[in-house]
UniProtKB/Swiss-Prot annotation:
It comes from the Bacteria. Belongs to the bacterial ribosomal protein bL27 family. Keywords: Ribonucleoprotein, Ribosomal protein. It comes from Mycobacterium marinum (strain ATCC BAA-535 / M). Signal peptide: none annotated. Coiled coil: none annotated. Pfam families: Ribosomal_L27. Residues 1-21 are annotated as: Disordered. This is Large ribosomal subunit protein bL27.
Amino acid sequence: MAHKKGASSSRNGRDSAAQRLGVKRFGGQVVKAGEILVRQRGTKFHPGVNVGRGGDDTLFAKAAGAVQFGIKRGRKTINIVEPATQDA
């Protein structure tokens, strides 16, 4: 078999689709239960209060509330807290 394919042909031209990783809901945003908060590879962010972790390390809200980012024991965590109610 030839290792050189000949004129006007190329071995390049392949590219993979982006994985759409990253933070999907930011601090202070109000979310419902089940909403995806972060899509990640590995645990860049760790689950906190009312946050679950899927098999692919995706973090999701287990309850409705506001997103809160924080640090606990040197790890970045995400919590879901009661949204601040405004009395007006």
